[in-house]
């Protein structure tokens, strides 16, 4: 088997694994009524999704660093096996508490599947080829977003909600087999140090922070006792983040090497990624609310109205992958930022009488901007460092993105009049959403500014090649 065929097999395995991890974030949503109907525990509804995302976020930087130390293949297989074990156990869960714990296990494995594939692509392909392949890989997230609720609904209607977890097993096993038999790595034999104090302090800090954000977003966060718990969690989070930073500065193999942030490309890419993901989560969560609460349309219609974004995002990812080696990082970033600014201004001026064609245009531009910008930044981060730091670099960028989404949905949630869309007066809801979209437009201006200051990626890659 020649090298090109081997590389194709590895790439297929990575695409499959990425799709499985991505779709698990959305496929459960349509199955939740059936799950709560059988297992009861409606009050724990939100934790089925939240615990998966929380576990994934916490383990992302850990897998990134361990893949630099022990190899991509080893850590990918370990993560995939944990993910499949969590999937199988979720399928046999008999109580809501069991399902929550098994979803947490699934998320612990998903941290590897959302990070290491991008790192392996960075290892296998040259800069020009890498951009195209990562563009296709980024489009998988958009495809998963579209197909997740659809697949979930079909499996629940025709088989069982348990099938949404069992379906991961055959595809996951194929991905593990293809990668384990095709990927070859030459690791330098040396004593390796695992930063256990860093892992522990980071895990505690992130768990407390994300749990506090979850309480703030949910109705559980109302009341004096809940407010006290939120303050306590945030205080613990700050203390352990400070401890984590001190440990990392002294560690010979830090989980998040601070030297990464001295690299201007990575520093600017992380700032841009954070802002983009704050905006991204607002668009995804609050546009459907506008459709239901202001336009007075049913939930099904709001899902259909988001299709332009779901189509434009993969399209933007593919275009970014094909253009970045020709046009450059700054060109793609600025183009994406301009589309985002135009769409966010459009959203901030919408009314109940805004024609559907304009709403579709704004939504399409938003999706195109996310595809162009986020994909080009992924390519930039994986290309800006050498092999021994690539896992940590990609993982840190993924972590920054999730942090942006978490903070975005929490802060903008506080600006919104709480309640369900059918119980809020359309004029009141429109006013709250206009405030949110106004601040999204302001943030979009900062995205444009950061994009204009983005370094030239080709020069950095060439310098890296010369150094090696």
Model region roles, listed by residue range:
Residues 1-6, 454-468:
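Intrinsic disorder in cytosolic terminal tails and internal cytosolic loops
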Residues 10-23, 28-30, 49, 81, ...:
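12-transmembrane solute porter fold
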Residues 50-64, 114-118, 307-320:
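Central cavity-lining transmembrane alpha-helices of secondary-active solute carriers
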Residues 157-272, 297, 441:
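Hydrophobic transmembrane-helix bundles of small-molecule transporters
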